[in-house]
């Protein structure tokens, strides 16, 4: 007899990629194609049910499909939420939605750099700012049903691709993953974080001349940060909290948890703590744990 788990594994998987224009949908689709997804760009929402019917016929090439949908569909886009809900109710295809967004200022910068017109401003009658704000309003409904919301404001193309690969490169969607990220408050808070912890109360290696050019990834800085009693107490209390909270997030159906650790510049204290937290979570949980240091190298002009 085929059990429930085997039935789930045999189902085709559909990932709908949508979000704000300029937030990175093209990058995501290209990356998904590289890791084995059958990708379709700008499919009119009205054709989505027909496409799903093809997936249900068992074609091996349509086992994992990613479809990018945006407001170029104009009036047709209004039906997208209803179309997705209808597909989910049929229970024949696993459907997930990824929504990409970025801060307005960043979107404006990207559009000016690319010199392309916004999809809502093809006739030139709207300002770029008004086009972006209207798009945010029009997409608000689809954002509410998204499984994955990714803020690309601070992400390079390389980092965005890494996020996509971390989540979708395996044969099946990963049921739950934890992303631990360090950042610097002076460079802006991490927008897509679920939990943010401020470690600026800990002794700062920045004021030790030999340690200043290093990061928390370097052993001397790591040991300096971790040697203090207050660091150890904080770490123990934080791990107790995370061990309590994380199973609850998973139980509620959350597929990804982003934990952000912030210090002043994102170079020393937050990096060391994020590193240790990631190692500890890997030991405790049978989940995929990823560690990312957003601002560790920004002082040298390189964001890795």
Curated annotation (Swiss-Prot):
Ligand binding (ATP): 19-26
Function recorded in the entry: Displays ATPase and GTPase activities.
GO MF: ATP binding; GTP binding
Domain of life: Bacteria
SUPFAM superfamilies in alphabetical order: P-loop containing nucleoside triphosphate hydrolases (SSF52540)
Keywords: ATP-binding, GTP-binding, Nucleotide-binding
Name recorded for this polypeptide: Nucleotide-binding protein SH2124
Keyword ATP-binding in annotation: yes
PANTHER family: RNASE ADAPTER PROTEIN RAPZ
Record organism: Staphylococcus haemolyticus (strain JCSC1435)
Binding locations of GTP: 70-73
Pfam family, one: PapZ_C
Record InterPro entries: P-loop_NTPase (IPR027417), RapZ-like (IPR005337), RapZ-like_N (IPR053930), RapZ_C (IPR053931)
Record bears the keyword ATP-binding: yes
Similarity annotation: Belongs to the RapZ-like family.
Source taxonomy: Bacteria, Bacillati, Bacillota, Bacilli, Bacillales
């Amino acid at each position: 007899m085929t059990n429930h788990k085997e039935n789930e594994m045999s189902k085709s998987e559909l990932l709908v990629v949508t979000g704000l224009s300029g937030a990175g949908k093209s990058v995501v689709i290209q990356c998904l194609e590289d890791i084995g997804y059958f990708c379709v760009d700008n499919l009119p929402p009205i054709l989505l049910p027909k496409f799903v019917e093809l997936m249900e016929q068992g074609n091996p090439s349509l086992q994992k499909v990613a479809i990018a949908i945006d407001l170029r569909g104009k009036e047709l886009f209004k039906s997208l939420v209803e179309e997705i809900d209808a597909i989910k109710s049929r229970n024949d295809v696993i459907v997930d939605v990824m929504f990409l967004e970025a801060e307005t200022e960043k979107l404006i910068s990207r559009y000016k750099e690319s010199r392309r017109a916004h999809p809502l401003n093809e006739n030139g009658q709207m300002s770029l700012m008004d086009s972006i704000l209207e798009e945010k309003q029009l997409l608000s409904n689809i954002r509410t049903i998204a499984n994955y919301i990714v803020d690309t404001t601070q992400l390079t193309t390389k980092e965005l691709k890494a996020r996509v690969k971390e989540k979708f490169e395996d044969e099946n969607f990963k049921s739950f993953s934890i992303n631990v990220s360090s950042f610097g408050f002076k460079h802006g808070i991490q927008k897509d974080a679920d939990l943010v912890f401020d470690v600026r109360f800990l002794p700062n290696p920045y004021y030790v001349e030999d340690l200043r050019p290093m990061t928390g990834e370097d052993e001397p800085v790591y040991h300096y940060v971790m040697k203090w009693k207050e660091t150890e107490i904080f770490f123990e209390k934080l791990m107790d909290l995370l061990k309590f909270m994380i199973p609850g997030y998973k139980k509620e159906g959350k597929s990804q948890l982003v934990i952000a650790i912030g210090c002043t510049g994102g170079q020393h204290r937050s990096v060391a703590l994020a590193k240790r937290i990631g190692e500890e979570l890997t030991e405790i949980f049978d989940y995929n744990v990823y560690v990312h240091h957003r601002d560790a190298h920004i002082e040298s002009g390189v964001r890795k």
